[in-house]
Amino acid sequence: MKKILLVAFVLTMSWHLNAQLNIDSLSHINYQQLHGADLNDVWGYEDEMGNEYAIVGTSKGTSILDITNPTAPVEVFWHPGTESIWRDPCVYGDHAYVTTEANDGMLIIDLSPLPQSTNLPVSVYTGPAGQTWTSAHTCFCDSQGFAYIFGANRGNGGVIILNLNADPMQPVEVGVFDNWYCHDGYVRNDTMFLGHIYDGFFSIVDVTFKANPQLLATQVTPSLFTHNIWPSTSGQYVFTTDEVSGAYIAVYDISDLNAIHEVERIQNSPGAGVIPHNTHVKGDYLVTSYYSDGIVIHDCTNPENLVKVGEFDTYNGQTTGFDGCWGVYPFFTSGTIVAADITEGLFILGPTYSKGSYLKGNVTETGTNVPLGGVEVTLFNNPQPDNTNNSGDYITGIYHTGQANVLFEKVGYAPFSTTVNLVQGQEIVLDVQLTPLPPFNVQFNVTDASTGSPIFDAKIKLVHPLIVHQGATNALGEEQLTLFYQEPYEIYTGKWGYMPYCSSQTIDPSTGVINVLLQPGYGDDFELDLGWSINSTAQTGIWERGVPNATSSGSTVQADVPWDCGSSCYVTGNDANLHPDFDDVDQGNTVLVSPPMDLTGLTNPHFNYARGYYNFYGPQLVDDTLKILVSNGSQTVLMDQVVPPLGDSMQWEYKSIALNGLLPITSTMQISVVISDEDPDINITEAAFDEFYVTNYSVNGLVALQQEIKVFPNPAHTEVTFLGSFTNEDYAMFDGMGRCVQQGVCSEETLTLSVVDLEKGLYLLYIGDSRIRFIKD
């Protein structure tokens, strides 16, 4: 193939200048313009004359670039292939091996004619007769002349071991390790390190005898989606990535294979949900392709104290999805790095490897000298603070030289701040002592608003920026707490058979007692566990209560219902992985069932709730239905259902359904939310459920998206004011049993109502198509 000088496609020293640290842009190749292709992984090759080449896997084939002059790359070879988003190269000697999931087999390229000739011989390998395979996820070539194929479409998709020594163009299969699917791996000498992504762990395997690999150890990783693994230069540690939103680069001490343990973890952009992809060890540094954060370099001189010392953002934006830098190769003799960004092309980069500044020490209690574990240590506004261990020891670091502030914080202790003088490449020792805060006590009394009787086992959740307490009342309706912070707290209280309560209150030593009145009724905003049960046969996507995690396709809700208490709801599967097919309902059903309800005292009972549903994609029929059932203890009927396909982003829908006419009303009424995705027609199937409550009337037409309403005071004693734009709007106020206690028409934009004559408890005010809760104390 004729060499192509990439003048038209090279941009030098101009890419994302505001998102780089110790890495310079040397050139950039736009593969959309060159081949109309996205990029996958990348590897490197050096010929006998020292020329350097990038071997680039693209969605439409394999490209080889001469990058000996990194500011003027030249494409010297192009081999088209079946389109695929996975194409992964590795190199042994003078041969490149390229796997793909496009059923093209493994492409083998003879690189030995370079640089004199670009007419490079190729062959395709698909395995021995009777044991063929045509696709694989990745590959790796060790230093002893063996290639390791990961994730092939044969068996479990484990590891296939090929001997390249006799004829590199015609490999010979010599071994298999097929205990689990393997996504990626690394081999040093006779030890194989494997990432089992769908099983959530890594394994270490002895491959001294290639025909008989021996499992040595396994270890789960933080997000249970182990994508990539690489050992330290010393072999004492391994570094791993989980390919999920907000995951970590994690470090494990493997010096004792019977006691592997995590010693460090780090994120590049805490709180942003960015996904790490592939990490590589280069001496005392980790070089990681980090999707929408580009590439990141960490100083791993001490693997138990990773310090970010370099970054280059290849992707113009930051997402929680699979956008940005897929692969990176940092092993050229020249030091040049090549980074493959999926949509933005290939970046040729010049790094400056620099050391971090390190800080360590011990934290004890003032007066007693007792070591303090769990102390948060924040160095120079580092968004990833360290924590002391049980012995009070900490170690941290940052890329900074000179004066730096250090903040030490622990619940129950006064924070301590000081300044240290950091020196690049050196470890400074700083021991400190923390002084205990004076504790104070507060007591919660939870009583029935109608009878004044104490409520046993009422759930209490207290939320402060530094603590979350969850407890329950005793037989006297009391719970006593010891607190340290004289600050505002969020308070959530509830029990099945009562309407939920939430408020915000400053608690200090003068507070003494907090009285909470719960209004009889049935309601649940799912901030507390009030006893709903879950029955499931599904393998994934089981109902769970929590703050919903979004997916990349919008297949679940972004947040709970906006106007109820707290931020939790029930969702089917709530893993942080953004892929919509990772934790959706599969291979069975999952059923959410309420505790029983005595509704015999209501004349017109209605079940009110918010639901979300998504059912789309899949190679077969999109055929799953969300069903909501009502039971009276002896009879069950279908009350509500949603049929597919529903491919738009999941949104909350509000329902108010009359029970009269469906079945007799009893003292053992229950609601069930049923969703399933059965073989063989597996789809992406998700559901969400929130803000359940029972009324003695219909709220249809009153549950549209609310305008923002401000209410004060809340709780109210004599009168309550609602701020909004309510002129000429109808309003109605209901107690927890669904009885209308006030109604009328707003004459002004704000609405002020007297509540002097109302019983204590929770009330709902409807104004037009809006509503808000408030408490009468």
Report each predicted region and the residues it spans.
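Short, acidic Ser/Thr/Gly-rich low-complexity loop/linker segments typical of extracellular
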Residues: T368-G373, T378-Y399, P454-F456, H464-Q480
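Residue-level detector of functionally pivotal "anchor" positions at catalytic/ligand-binding pockets or at interdomain
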Residues: L349-G367, T435-Q443, G521-D525, D586, ...
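Extracellular glycan-recognition surfaces and repeat-rich motifs
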Residues: V42, Y522-D581
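Feature marking well-ordered beta-strand scaffolds used for ligand recognition
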Residues: A19-G367
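Short Pro-Gly-centered beta-turn/loop motif in secreted/extracellular proteins
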Residues: D393-N405, V411, E478-E490, W496
